[in-house]
Amino acid sequence: GIIAVEVANIYSTLGSEVNIIARSKALKEIDSDIKDYIFKNLLSEINILEETDVVECEKNKVITNKNEELEGVPFFATGRVANSEIVRDIVELNPDNTLKVNEMMETTKEHVYAAGDVTGGYQLTPVARMEGITAARNMANYPNKVVYHAIPQTLSLNTEVSFVEDEKNNCSEEDKVDIGIPGIAGPGAFWKILSGDTGYTKISFDKKQNKIKKINSISPSSVSDVAYLSYLMRINSPLDEYGDFLEIHPSTDANYKIIKSMWL
């Protein structure tokens, strides 16, 4: 998963030899083109073993179901377990032991609210903050419902990888248009021009509704770029409105002009 890859990248950058063992596919939630770029350009020093299980784990080695013995200190990044024991007899839990809440972040016990990782769902700091604000407003008798729509996410590597998808847009493959371009050198990427590792951006459009379906960006500025683009997706802005932005150079202004020319 994402956390495993982030931790692996840290140790690899520090000079360690790193193996990632994935029970299914590594980064399966990432667009295939973006994943290929990540493996080739950002994680090239890391050995990735997919469709592999660990059958034996010792202090300084692991043995896989493919009879491979890998030496080194094992580091587990297999997800989180909700620490909900303290309220098990007070509120109702989901099958995975997370707290069951409604869209106002209220648990099954009236006037008891919960937010963040303990409720399951998106285990991201900004989402936990959004849930906490929703819960606080409802506690203060300001009715508010949490909305999980076009949630931006990032994979923190030596170059940030950010992505967002409008899951409410069910455009067909016939109506979907994909545009991918290399990253344009800018702050944080000037010295990568010679290697060609300036990043990559891929955007999927719904040509019928004139809306953005999905954005994937590998860029030093992708965290902020995708964050505000996700807001435009949440308020259902058509593509034409994206051209009204006047941005500070150098940022995404050049990217927008290129993508617009390719689309039109």
Features from the language model and the residues they span:
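Rossmann-like dinucleotide-binding cores of NAD(P)H-dependent redox enzymes
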Residues: 2-56, 137, 143-170
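General small-molecule cofactor/ligand-binding pocket signal
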Residues: 47-49, 113, 180
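Short loop/edge segments at beta-strand edges and connector loops
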Residues: 50-52, 58, 95, 181
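Conserved beta-strand-loop-beta-strand element in the redox core of flavoprotein oxidoreductases
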Residues: 57-68, 74
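FAD-site-proximal beta/loop scaffold in flavoenzymes
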Residues: 69, 73-138
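Mid-to-C-terminal Rossmann-like scaffold of FAD/NAD(P)H-dependent oxidoreductases
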Residues: 118-223, 261-264
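Cysteine/selenocysteine-centered motifs that mediate thiol-based redox chemistry or coordinate metal-sulfur cofactors
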Residues: 144, 235-264
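A short, polar/charged loop-to-alpha-helix boundary motif
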Residues: 222-235
